[in-house]
Amino acid sequence: MYRVRPYAIALLVIISAFPTTLTVGNAESEDSLPEWGFYVYMAGDNTLYEEVTDDLNEMKMVGSNNNLEIVTLTDQLLGNDSHAYHVIKHGVEETPLSEINTTWENEIDMGDGETLKDFMVWATTEYPAQRKILVIWDHGSGWKKVAEDQGSYLTVPEIRKSIEDYREITGDPPLTLIGFDACLMGMFEIAYELKDQAEMIHGSEAYEPLEGWTYNHL
């Protein structure tokens, strides 16, 4: 099932029953870090490839600042078009993919849980923040799958495992929020699977419009 324009958005926020005190899993003083880290996993190697550019441009309108880090991993429809960006005001700072994972070339599989894990390890280590938000961006099919990439996709158990592994490596506490900019991901089954990995889960119970979230209001 895919994102379509005419439908209204119904959002579901599910709060974990056991919120965790926020800490930072690195040597930097928490007070010196930006309050918010916004890490966006943009799986656009499908019919949403043009929306990757549109949403990235919206993020550039805001840009990272003393209170906010915006970091993205993007993939679009053509080959050799995967990129890791630190989004700044009206621009981006790109990190070569081989610096994140030495096996990565210029085309990565966004439907692989290892890709999500490696992105989060890199993004939260290089651009740490007091409160961390992971957004998984793409088509969604509820508990069945999300982040489609030429036949591969992420399942919800894969997402849980990816976040568990990233947290084990970095020592980070549960995320402040996991958000799905994708259709049909506001399900109790999804929230239950991810309940130990984030304080809040945010997703749509219905179809999202093609444009998805509005990122120029971060």
What are the roles of these predicted feature ranges?
Residues 1-31:
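Secretory targeting signatures
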Residues 29-130:
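N-terminal extension/subdomain marker
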Residues 99, 140-169:
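A short, glycine/acidic-enriched catalytic loop
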Residues 123-143:
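Active-site groove signature of glycoside hydrolases
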Residues 37-42, 69-74, 132-136, 176-180, ...:
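Structural recognition of the beta-strand scaffold that forms the well-ordered cores
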Residues 44-47, 76-80, 138-144, 150-153, ...:
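Solvent-exposed loop/turn segments at secondary-structure junctions
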Residues 57-61, 161-165, 189-195:
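Mature extracellular/periplasmic domains of secretome proteins
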Residues 175-218:
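Active-site-proximal C-terminal subdomain of hydrolase catalytic domains
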